[in-house]
């Protein structure tokens, strides 16, 4: 495993992600007609948990990838589904989720950092998102922001190589170095209507569709980490059980609680 290189040296597990896609690790959130398996959130959580048993950062990038695919799958944009979903499901296209600021701003935790202006054939986007993960020059991601003069939200696909858009690597993280978490600068970035997942009049219903699964799917990271912690407790118990037996929570207790939660 490349865990040390990923965590300490910032190695991005791109080769693994693309190989995982070929094995179907991202296919659960994509319908069969677009190259997925259609197995749903439960399959996505299971795949993510398996990865998380070894590397939580890589499990996080799996969540980013599947969240991106799911946002597109749950939109009404048939052309975008046909264009992007087969490649996202197979790992040929990698993608991120840039909706943290959108969701937090809807809850008045943050202010919106992007603005959209309606122009002929699409929208013009300006602003900066400080943290978006699982990105690269040939990646895509989904984000959302209010439209000037309207106030309602616009959700759309961003291609990292498009004019006016810039990725900035200006931060160092304790545990996210290998996740390609970058700042995203928008300077009059043109988003065509063909890249819009929800126009303002569609945004309330669209947000209700995507938000529950976006949160629920993150369980996969936690489950994988807990499994690995139990493994470490078992391993330590082979030499230190005479001391560890006094801990309030034993491996079997945690195993039972996890099994109940997964059931």
Segment roles from a protein language model:
Residues 128-162:
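DPxDG-like acidic metal-binding loop motif
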Residues 261-263:
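Long, low-complexity C-terminal extensions of enzymes
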Residues 12-128, 133:
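Glycine-rich flavin
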Residues 106-108, 117-118, 133-136, 147-150, ...:
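Solvent-exposed alpha-helices and their adjacent loops that cap or buttress functional pockets
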Residues 102, 113, 169-176:
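Short Gly/Thr-rich strand-loop-strand
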Residues 171-259:
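Glycine-rich beta->alpha junctions and the first turn(s) of the following alpha-helix
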Residues 113-115, 140-144, 155-157, 181-188:
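Conserved hydrophobic/aromatic beta-strand scaffold that supports enzyme active sites
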Residues 47, 125-127, 156, 186, ...:
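Buried hydrophobic positions in well-ordered alpha/beta secondary-structure cores of metabolic enzymes
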């Amino acid at each position: 495993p490349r865990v040390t290189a990923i965590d300490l040296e910032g190695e991005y597990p791109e080769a693994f992600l693309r190989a995982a896609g070929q094995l179907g690790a991202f296919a659960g959130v994509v319908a069969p007609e677009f190259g997925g398996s259609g197995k749903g959130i439960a399959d996505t959580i299971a795949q993510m948990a398996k990865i998380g048993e070894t590397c939580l950062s890589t499990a996080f990038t799996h969540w980013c990838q599947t969240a991106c695919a799911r946002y597109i799958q749950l939109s009404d944009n048939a052309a975008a589904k046909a264009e992007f979903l087969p490649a996202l499901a197979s790992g040929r296209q990698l993608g991120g989720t840039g909706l943290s600021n959108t969701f937090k701003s809807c809850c008045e935790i943050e202010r919106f950092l992007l603005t959209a202006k309606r122009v002929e054939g699409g929208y013009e986007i300006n602003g900066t998102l400080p943290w978006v993960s699982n990105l690269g020059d040939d990646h895509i991601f989904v984000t959302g922001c209010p439209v000037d003069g309207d106030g309602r939200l616009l959700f759309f696909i961003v291609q990292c190589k498009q004019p006016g858009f810039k990725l900035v690597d200006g931060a160092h993280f304790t545990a996210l170095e290998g996740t390609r978490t970058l700042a995203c600068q928008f300077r009059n970035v043109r988003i065509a209507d063909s890249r819009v997942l929800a126009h303002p009049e569609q945004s309330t219903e669209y947000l209700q569709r995507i938000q529950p699964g976006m949160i629920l799917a993150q369980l996969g990271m936690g489950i994988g980490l807990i499994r690995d912690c139990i493994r470490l407790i078992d391993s330590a118990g082979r030499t230190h059980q005479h001391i560890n037996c006094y801990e309030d929570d034993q491996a079997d207790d945690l195993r039972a609680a996890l099994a109940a939660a997964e059931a």
